From Swiss-Prot:
<keyword id="KW-0346">Stress response</keyword>
<dbReference type="Pfam" id="PF00011">
    <property type="entry name" value="HSP20"/>
</dbReference>
<feature type="domain" description="sHSP">
    <location>
        <begin position="46"/>
        <end position="161"/>
    </location>
</feature>
<dbReference type="InterPro" id="IPR008978">
    <property type="entry name" value="HSP20-like_chaperone"/>
</dbReference>
<dbReference type="GO" id="GO:0009408">
    <property type="term" value="P:response to heat"/>
</dbReference>
<dbReference type="GO" id="GO:0005737">
    <property type="term" value="C:cytoplasm"/>
</dbReference>
<dbReference type="GO" id="GO:0006457">
    <property type="term" value="P:protein folding"/>
</dbReference>
<dbReference type="GO" id="GO:0051082">
    <property type="term" value="F:unfolded protein binding"/>
</dbReference>
<comment type="similarity">
    <text>Belongs to the small heat shock protein (HSP20) family.</text>
</comment>
<dbReference type="InterPro" id="IPR031107">
    <property type="entry name" value="Small_HSP"/>
</dbReference>
<dbReference type="GO" id="GO:0042542">
    <property type="term" value="P:response to hydrogen peroxide"/>
</dbReference>
<dbReference type="GO" id="GO:0051259">
    <property type="term" value="P:protein complex oligomerization"/>
</dbReference>
<dbReference type="GO" id="GO:0009651">
    <property type="term" value="P:response to salt stress"/>
</dbReference>
<protein>
    <recommendedName>
        <fullName>17.5 kDa class II heat shock protein</fullName>
    </recommendedName>
</protein>
<keyword id="KW-0963">Cytoplasm</keyword>
<dbReference type="InterPro" id="IPR002068">
    <property type="entry name" value="A-crystallin/Hsp20_dom"/>
</dbReference>
Length: 161
């Protein structure tokens, strides 16, 4: 159980939680790598991180804007795609810088994969999607299709019999 849910993020609780974390590569009971067959704490934490990647969705007069926090990521770490014709997928991975001459005394920044999916409205123009990442904030803009022209009523000629 994660003690942070109950406000138990004291130094002692944090230290105990780190002691309970078993690295993915270590063998668990019975020598299996999964540590008993259940999901690892890292997997669960990554899944939670994917679900809580902060995003704002705004409707503007001519477009929709999806604004997602991406601190520390470059354009090569972020992927923006459209799946199944109308599902916008924003994904990527934050990697830890590896240096052989450095020894971490504390590692608190979240590393790993993230993904968010958004169903686009019917009036979204799939051919006019752009993405810009500036100062750790990704903005994906999806332009709207022009509104359909109102149909003119069809006049039927009335014949006299």
């Amino acid at each position: 159980m994660d003690g942070r849910m109950f406000g138990l993020e004291t130094p002692l609780m944090v230290a105990l939680q780190h002691l309970l974390d078993v690295p993915d590569g270590d063998a668990g009971a019975g020598g299996d790598k999964a540590g008993g067959g259940g999901p690892t704490r890292t997997y669960v934490a990554d899944a939670r991180a994917m679900a809580v990647t902060p995003a704002d969705v705004k409707e503007l007069p001519g477009a929709y804007a999806f604004v997602v926090d991406m601190p520390g990521l470059g354009t090569g770490d972020i992927k923006v795609q459209v799946e199944d014709e109308r599902v916008l997928v924003i994904s990527g991975e934050r990697r830890r810088e590896e240096r052989e001459d450095a020894k971490y005394l504390r590692m608190e920044r979240r590393m790993g994969k993230f993904m968010r999916k958004f169903v686009l409205p019917d009036n979204a123009d799939m051919d006019k999607i752009s993405a810009v990442c500036r100062d750790g904030v990704l903005t994906v803009t999806v332009e709207k299709l022009p509104p359909p022209e109102p149909k003119k009523p069809k006049t039927i000629e009335v014949k006299v019999a």
